[in-house]
């Protein structure tokens, strides 16, 4: 999610990545019911609302308290906001008795530009602030708290698994040694330590890039959240309902791609297995079909460099 909204009033300017394409992929119906699972600062939600008819409905979700405050600026009666993780979207839909009636779901994954650009949130190695990184600061351990209690092996596993950091063990050892003598509480402290401990310099990338990504993903359980959200979307979509997902790195995109592929194939039956037609029917068939993917063009990347790694994938629920 890279959403460069400047203010939270109704007239603000924004640069949501693949904005038009992601919403167009939902195939908006005038009276449809839609979910924006990652409200952010509302770029996608506002565009969806502009295309809905008077009987349409949009349910937005976000776990970031600042996003909830931004959503309060929207007074449209067709719009409602839920404060919570998008991984619980099926739960929210069940409470509303709308399972099987959702015409489209949009998920814009990862961290948003307002979160990155606010030093007090602790997401960025480019700005000094509290070493926090939580999407919802009221829940769970901050990055500083986790790094203080985690072992070098645990930290190395996180850096390797979620950041694909080649020097994970070396950096983890340096983090633990530093915290034993002078606990880190600021993003600049962690970024400087990683820069000094890393034996390799990439002139195009800060040495702390992968480590900050990895710690953020772990602290917020981002990949597990994505898996649960996709399963929930599959449960609640109406026949011919659309799923539109924007990812920003290979770990996210791999989950989305594999999810769509899995539900597009139907049951995999070993050759020669003796099954009756009734048994085959009971196993069900494919429940999704892929309707393509997109990446930002050169013009969008030039305007918004953070869009460079984004991938937009679409799927459609097959009617039953």
Curated annotation (Swiss-Prot):
A GO-annotated cellular component: cytoplasm
E.C. code: 2.1.1.199
UniProt cross-references to SUPFAM superfamilies, sorted A to Z: Putative methyltransferase TM0872, insert domain, S-adenosyl-L-methionine-dependent methyltransferases
Enzyme class (EC, first level): transferase
Annotated catalysed reactions: cytidine(1402) in 16S rRNA + S-adenosyl-L-methionine = N(4)-methylcytidine(1402) in 16S rRNA + S-adenosyl-L-homocysteine + H(+)
Entry GO MF terms: rRNA (cytosine-N4-)-methyltransferase activity
Predominant cellular place of this UniProt entry's protein: cytoplasm
One Gene Ontology biological process: rRNA base methylation
Alphabetical UniProt keywords: Cytoplasm, Methyltransferase, rRNA processing, S-adenosyl-L-methionine, Transferase
Residues annotated to bind S-adenosyl-L-methionine: 42-44, 62, 86, 108, 115
Keyword Manganese carried by entry: no
Family: Belongs to the methyltransferase superfamily. RsmH family.
UniProt xrefs under PANTHER family: 12S RRNA N4-METHYLCYTIDINE METHYLTRANSFERASE, S-ADENOSYL-METHYLTRANSFERASE MRAW
Functional note: Specifically methylates the N4 position of cytidine in position 1402 (C1402) of 16S rRNA.
UniProt cross-references to HAMAP family, sorted A to Z: 16SrRNA_methyltr_H
Record protein name field: Ribosomal RNA small subunit methyltransferase H
